[in-house]
Design a protein with these regions (language model features):
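N-terminal alpha-helical scaffold/docking segments in eukaryotic complex subunits
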Residues: 1-60, 171, 175, 187, ...
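Extended alpha-helical scaffolding segments
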Residues: 132, 149-204, 208
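Hydrophobic, well-structured mid-protein blocks that either form specific transmembrane helices
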Residues: 77-128
Length: 215
């Protein structure tokens, strides 16, 4: 696929061949730059397509997008919730190739996205946080503390209950790597969610317990 065809696909509504643009983008620096900027575009269709392709491409070759670190880091402070979501997820994908340890200077600020004014932003932040957990063992204690701090956020109670399903999914991915002390904290958190007001969270907590032999 040539660059012109890839560009045409990215502006289409729900194109069936969207992910066929990934390889051309990985091979073409100009297309990559356009994709990154497109992920912050005003046009919803174009932005949505760019974001989907961006994360597929970053998963395959994150190093190709490391030069755009600053653009993504700026995104987490954008007044636009969609931009904050993109920035949060992109930084997580780049953590494994962060040779200049740029994450260090913004990490505490980054973790505050769990308390974002938009629940959507917190959801996507949580969705990719395990990528940082695996890439940066030195940040693991802070990540666990962050995951267990949701009740301290400003989210309305109903939204907190929804987000706890995301947190349980995170904890499921990292549970076997936790210290005994942190496992006890997590188990206590999971047991509390069996009484959650969210059916999804209750179900997720129950499945977590069965998987990890808690009951």
């Amino acid at each position: 696929m040539d660059a012109a065809t890839a560009r045409k696909i990215l502006v289409q509504h729900e194109p069936a061949d969207l992910y066929e643009t990934v390889q051309p983008i990985l091979k073409n620096g100009k297309l990559r730059a356009e994709l990154v900027e497109g992920s912050f575009a005003k046009n919803e269709t174009f932005r949505y397509n760019c974001v989907r392709v961006l994360f597929r491409a970053m998963n395959l070759r994150p190093n190709s997008f490391y030069p755009y670190w600053d653009r993504f880091a700026e995104g987490i402070d954008s007044p636009n919730g969609f931009h904050r979501s993109v920035g949060a997820q992109a930084i997580a994908y780049l953590a494994s190739v962060d040779k200049d340890t740029r994450l260090d200077s913004i990490f505490d600020h980054y973790l505050k996205l769990i308390d974002d004014s938009k629940v959507m932003v917190s959801h996507y932040f949580l969705d990719t946080l395990p990528l940082i957990y695996r890439a940066r063992p030195d940040f693991q204690p802070k990540i666990v503390t962050c995951l267990l701090s949701l009740d301290k956020t400003r989210h309305p109670p109903s939204r907190k209950e929804m987000l706890k399903a995301d947190i349980i999914s995170n904890l499921d991915q990292i549970f076997n790597t936790l210290s005994s002390k942190d496992k006890k904290k997590v188990i206590s958190f999971i047991k509390d969610q069996l009484q959650s007001g969210s059916p999804k969270t209750r179900k997720t907590a129950k499945e977590f317990g069965k998987k990890h032999g808690l009951w």
